[in-house]
């Protein structure tokens, strides 16, 4: 960043501080990851200069012959990665991918069945503060109070009762596998479209470690970061028959020009995900997640559902008389980054919460194995059981620094 350092030291300094934070902290936010240097290079390329409204071979601007190559690579790699007939890599985010699907097949006021946000769903699955809840009549399904897992009989009952035009499966804070085949059966029974939002688990799906929703869903949406370890962005996968409608829904429906530098980075990330090393990485994610859950529970920390099948876990803080807001702050002070999170049947406000969400995708990228992640679990539990003990917190902070120093991040930057 030689030019930036010379021209705009304020921005340069802020970026360097953020790099220092990422290096020094144990990153456990489930929606975050560390992209490769080559993904960052693509993001910072001259492709950021190019307007390319439309699609490869059908642009509204001249001079698109080379960005066409990049977008075709991204689409082809995405289709290969997930076994899809159609891919649209232009959505700027997962939220816009979801919006485009809704825009393509729903009318304002249509009924949609989606997962309750506090039970693990997402804002774009019908939250009243989100466009989805404003434009469409969302009705909810959730998890059982005893198991904290999805009960497909209850989902079916809700579908039969409300007769939705679409069912949305997928979650932002659900630690167990989702059975997309069962969702397909329910959707077929009521004549509904099925959209799966696999944003959090896309990398695990690509690695064959979670059921692939593409064969079951009419529409599959995802972000391209999180476990897929690409740039921040979105994508839609579907059968070829939906190409024209979905393409129009993205452009000119809800977006203008695509971000060609981001699409290039998506292509690079998809190429990485097609390599055997990526499967090895995702297998380590699962091992780390299970080890973290096991370690926390061994130290009297309540993990919802008793464990995890993916990259994340939810910790219930009520037995410790703590709030997510307080724990997030104290953990951050000792160098462990998490986010406060609502838990099913929440009694606190979304700004306070009774839980935290913890994910291992980023630290696994960094090289953490089961031995390292067990240390992380011990550190978290020590904080939770000694949240006002300054001596313990200082000791944890020092051990966090020792651990992160053992796993250097971006040494060439």
From Swiss-Prot:
Entry cofactors: pyridoxal 5'-phosphate
PTM annotation (N6-(pyridoxal phosphate)lysine): residues: 226
A cellular-component GO term for this protein: cytosol
Site (Plays an important role in substrate specificity): 225
GO biological process: glycine biosynthetic process from serine; tetrahydrofolate interconversion
Extent of the signal sequence: none
Keywords, in A-Z order: Amino-acid biosynthesis, Cytoplasm, One-carbon metabolism, Pyridoxal phosphate, Transferase
Matches recorded under InterPro entries: PyrdxlP-dep_Trfase, PyrdxlP-dep_Trfase_major, PyrdxlP-dep_Trfase_small, Ser_HO-MeTrfase, Ser_HO-MeTrfase-like, Ser_HO-MeTrfase_PLP_BS, SHMT-like_dom
EC class of the enzyme, as a word: transferase
Top-level taxon of origin: Bacteria
GO molecular function, one term: pyridoxal phosphate binding
Keyword flag Ribonucleoprotein: no
EC number: 2.1.2.1
Pfam families according to UniProt: SHMT
Organism the protein comes from: Listeria welshimeri serovar 6b (strain ATCC 35897 / DSM 20650 / CCUG 15529 / CIP 8149 / NCTC 11857 / SLCC 5334 / V8)
Function: Catalyzes the reversible interconversion of serine and glycine with tetrahydrofolate (THF) serving as the one-carbon carrier. This reaction serves as the major source of one-carbon groups required for the biosynthesis of purines, thymidylate, methionine, and other important biomolecules. Also exhibits THF-independent aldolase activity toward beta-hydroxyamino acids, producing glycine and aldehydes, via a retro-aldol mechanism.
Residues given in the record as (6S)-5,6,7,8-tetrahydrofolate binding sites: 117, 121-123, 349-351
Pathway assigned in UniProt: One-carbon metabolism; tetrahydrofolate interconversion; Amino-acid biosynthesis; glycine biosynthesis; glycine from L-serine: step 1/1
UniProt family annotation: Belongs to the SHMT family.
Protein name according to UniProt: Serine hydroxymethyltransferase
Catalytic reactions of this protein: (6R)-5,10-methylene-5,6,7,8-tetrahydrofolate + glycine + H2O = (6S)-5,6,7,8-tetrahydrofolate + L-serine
Keyword Transferase included in the entry's annotation: yes
